């Protein structure tokens, strides 16, 4: 599987995409989580749709519109990768067991702060996937995929249909609720 990130430029691109990460996150240390996040995205959008983004990613001279389109796929993958990585980065795993990472300039956040941050990151991820799905549901190429046709076969197949009875405001949630 081809990832939408290059090892050589990963740390800088990851920081720029997320905007709140100030560390140089090593590609090799997150590659398995990046792969998991990518596979999860492929499950949502399908391999042919993901492959279109790979082609766009590998393109040499992209237009501004193409860069915006690429961001729609890369941001949720990066956000999900961070959600998977962050909890294990809070602790140092040593021969003596798990240890707290500290230094003179930083203070350890309270548990409730970490939980709120994790919840906020999860909401960011869900919003990003919903934005991608909104884009895809208007895309003629996506309308030809198995993923789109599977969703359309249900009696309640859009968020508008579902929201007549219960407000969810999320295509991702609707997809997860589908049988």
Which residue stretches match the model-derived regions?
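Conserved short "hinge" loops at termini or chain/domain junctions
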Residues: 1-74, 88-179
């Amino acid at each position: 599987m081809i990832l939408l990130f290059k090892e050589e430029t990963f740390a800088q691109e990851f920081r720029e995409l997320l905007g709140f990460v100030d560390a140089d996150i090593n590609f090799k240390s997150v590659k398995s989580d990046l792969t998991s996040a990518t596979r999860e995205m492929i499950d949502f959008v399908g391999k042919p749709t993901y492959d279109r983004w790979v082609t766009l990613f590998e393109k040499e001279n992209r237009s501004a519109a193409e860069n915006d389109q690429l961001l729609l796929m890369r941001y949720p993958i990066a956000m999900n990768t961070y959600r998977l990585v962050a909890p294990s980065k809070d602790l140092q795993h040593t021969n003596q067991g798990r240890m707290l990472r500290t230094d003179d300039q930083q203070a350890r956040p309270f548990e409730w702060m970490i939980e709120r941050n994790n919840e906020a990151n999860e909401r960011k991820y869900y919003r990003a996937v919903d934005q991608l799905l909104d884009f895809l549901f208007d895309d003629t190429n996506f309308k030809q995929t198995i993923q789109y046709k599977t969703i359309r076969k249900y009696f309640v197949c859009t968020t508008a249909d579902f929201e007549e009875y219960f407000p969810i405001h999320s295509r991702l949630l609707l997809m997860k609720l589908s049988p």
